[in-house]
Amino acid sequence: MKFIDEARIEVIAGDGGDGSASMRREKFVPFGGPDGGDGGRGGSVYAIADRNINTLIDYRYAKKHLARNGENGRGSDCYGKGGDDITLRMPVGTVITDMDTGELIADLTEHDQQVLLAKGGAGGLGNLHFKSSTNRAPRQKTDGKPGERRMLKLELKVLADVGLLGMPNAGKSTFISSVSNAKPKIADYPFTTLAPNLGVVRVGPSKSFVIADIPGLIEGAAEGAGLGHQFLRHLQRTGLLLHLVDIAPFDEGVDPVAEATAIVGELRKYDEALYEKPRWLVLNKLDMVPEDERAARVADFLERFDWHGPVFEISALTGQGCEALCYAIYDYLAEHSDAHRAAEAEDLAADVRFRDAPPAANAAPGDDA
């Protein structure tokens, strides 16, 4: 299935039905009085998170979603039927934003999480409501209210614990296929990976974490060069970044230090918060370096790159060093997961784009407004 991580849709809630101005007409009841019923409420549009969906491709082609209008009220105290609600199922990790106001409507982070996108209009009042001691036969009634109409932007940010960074052909896909159940396309040319891949790494019974591989970055990615800039958003939810560097490039004219520096620069240009995330350096393709040269090459790289954080030496192809790296990742995540969740919750709470949702925002489909 094609991976689509962004879409724009229009949601239109149903209009409320009009109230009825009707009088009771019955034999032997000369002054029956008003009996006009209210109009039905318009249908609302909801979104619900579904962990069984992993792409927004359905919304790339179905751009308009309309709920039904409420029926008009009728005589004999007959109220109009409410319009049916519609529910749009979206992948877990979808961020929904109002394109006109910039308002952040929802961040779907849990399976079955439900949010109101567009509220149906209230039904109009029948003339029954306008009866009084001075107006025994009212002719007044009100029309139904229009439903909400919104243009929405949907962005999918995959939920992963660890994100992989690196130039094209740094060995990211080989690494994720080596340590997880993911089976990405692997080849000896750049940009083999065209969409994010997720893999589950298991280090023991009930001990696992999710790792995300995005297309490789190149210099200028933050300005739109290459493919990686389209997918950097998928790293924003991760708790740890692994920066993979090809320590033994096939082209002798390529400097691994310059490439690693360019990646860090692009990360900072795109998002300062992403740049500040915990990041580990992983020197890959160690099997391509003669054993007697490895220590010197690694030391030279670290000195010129001026790196003082965690560093791991691996060969994704042979598996050398991968097991130790995975155990270290799991231990780190287990130690810092609570702090990471707390930081995410704090960021969401501080996001001024979140609206003060009315109580109806959490109502279940079909509840009367």
Swiss-Prot record:
Record domain Obg: where: 1-159
PROSITE patterns to which the protein is assigned, alphabetical: G_OBG, GTP1_OBG, OBG
Keyword Cytoplasm recorded: yes
Ligand binding (Mg(2+)): S173, T193
GO molecular function: GTP binding; GTPase activity; magnesium ion binding
Keywords, in A-Z order: Cytoplasm, GTP-binding, Hydrolase, Magnesium, Metal-binding, Nucleotide-binding
Residue span, OBG-type G domain: 160-334
Subcellular location, record wording: Cytoplasm
Example of a GO cellular component annotation carried by this entry: cytoplasm
E.C. number(s) listed in UniProt: 3.6.5.-
Region (Disordered): 128-147
Cofactor(s) named in the record: Mg(2+)
Database matches in InterPro entries: G_OBG, GTP-bd, GTP-bd_Obg/CgtA, GTP1-OBG_CS, GTP1_OBG_dom, GTP1_OBG_dom_sf, OBG_GTPase, P-loop_NTPase
Amino-acid positions noted as binding GTP in the UniProt annotation, renumbered to this chain: 166-173, 191-195, 213-216, 284-287, 315-317
GO biological process: ribosome biogenesis
PANTHER family assigned to the protein according to its UniProt record, in alphabetical order: DEVELOPMENTALLY REGULATED GTP-BINDING PROTEIN-RELATED, MITOCHONDRIAL RIBOSOME-ASSOCIATED GTPASE 2
NCBIfam families in the record: Obg_CgtA, PRK12296.1, PRK12297.1, PRK12299.1
Annotated function: An essential GTPase which binds GTP, GDP and possibly (p)ppGpp with moderate affinity, with high nucleotide exchange rates and a fairly low GTP hydrolysis rate. Plays a role in control of the cell cycle, stress response, ribosome biogenesis and in those bacteria that undergo differentiation, in morphogenesis control.
Subunit structure: Monomer.
Family note: Belongs to the TRAFAC class OBG-HflX-like GTPase superfamily. OBG GTPase family.
Name assigned to this protein: GTPase Obg
Lineage: Bacteria, Pseudomonadati, Pseudomonadota, Betaproteobacteria, Burkholderiales
This protein's encoding gene: obg
